[in-house]
Structure formats: structure tokens, C-alpha cells
């Protein structure tokens, strides 16, 4: 079900889900890879990063660390420091060639993949084939589109780039006025803060509504658009 209300010229809506639960391992970490490059939009990756980093699953292990199920790392074309929006400098953890397998892949808006688009596409195709879920935030959907990962699927992106996306990727079923769109293995969110909603949905799919709600509460995040 989609609910919305007018906010100026922009519709604020909940998400659309065509996806079921994800199976979490009984023990061990769920690796989460964040694909970043120059001009990566900070909130697009920092929002989901804080969500996954803040998940606590009571009774999952004997120690506090064991109850924190996600292990996070960044992947980039090289290990040279990148400059994200606002001048934030980040030293990537891995290159495409050296990155370990990930069960969750997060692709934020960014502007530094132009010269590395073939490498990024190759890595995304290989990594997403092994992952449980690949998610984009904002115009990160264009990266998934270029890789062919959205062909024949429903998707969304940043509201100011919807028309451009529709022209570039006519094979994708574009949805407007929604916070996110979930398919079984590929999901996309609208811009900026919508990535937090989609990340919470990933938590919900792995560990259920109670854990996801507790995560949102601990973040003091009052948005409810992730609940579908």
C-alpha cells in the first residue's frame, strides 16, 4: 500500500515492496559494502551506515559485539582518499579487485565513477550475484541502471532526476512519489534521507519489525515511511 501527502511540489510517500524476508546467518557477521567515489553524497551512505551500525539483535550471541550483526566497509576504484560532498575525506577500505564478498551492497549518489565505469559495472555484477540485496540511494540508481541490474524491474531515484532516468532507462519501470522500491534482490530509494528508510527495511527483512523499530528508536529517527 502506498500512502502520500502533498508537501509543496513533492510527494512524500512510503515505500513499495515486492520482496520477502531475508535469511540472516545464525552466527557471524553480515558484510555490507558501500561503493564510493569522488563527490559521494555523504548522507546517502552515512544514513544507511548508521542504521546498519546501530542494529542490535538481543540473544544473537554471548557478547555485545556478537549481537551487532553487520560488518561495514567501503569499496572504491582505488585506495586513494576520496573527497565526498562538503569536503569530507575518506580512505576506502578496499579496491574493486580486493573487496571481500558482501551480502548487502549500498550505492549512493556520486560523481567519480566516470573513468572507472567498466570496473564498477564488473564489480557490481559479480558482487550483486553473491549478495542478498543491492540497494541504491538517490542517483545511485543510475549506477545500477548502467550495470543493467534494474532491467525489467521497478525502481525510483531522486525526484529531480526522474525524467532523466526515464529517458535513459526505458526498460526500467520507474515509480514516482515513493520513498523506495524493493525487489527481491535489488532495491532503490529516493534521495538523501530516503536511504535511511530503505536501510531500515533491509534490517526489517533480516531481523523483523521489532529489531528495525528498536534501531530507528535508538537513532531517534521518527520517520515511518520504512514500514510497509
Where would I find each of the regions flagged by the language model?
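Extended, subdomain-level signal for the structured scaffold at the beginning of enzyme domains
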Residues: 1-134, 142-146, 163-168, 174-177, ...
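Structural detector of well-ordered beta-strand residues that form the stable sheet scaffold
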Residues: 134-135, 156, 175, 187
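Short, glycine-/small-residue-rich phosphate/pyrophosphate-handling segment
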Residues: 151-164
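Short active-site oxyanion
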Residues: 129-133, 150-154, 185
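Alpha-helix boundary/capping and short turn/kink residues
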Residues: 155, 192, 205-209
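Phosphate-binding/catalytic loops
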Residues: 182-186, 203
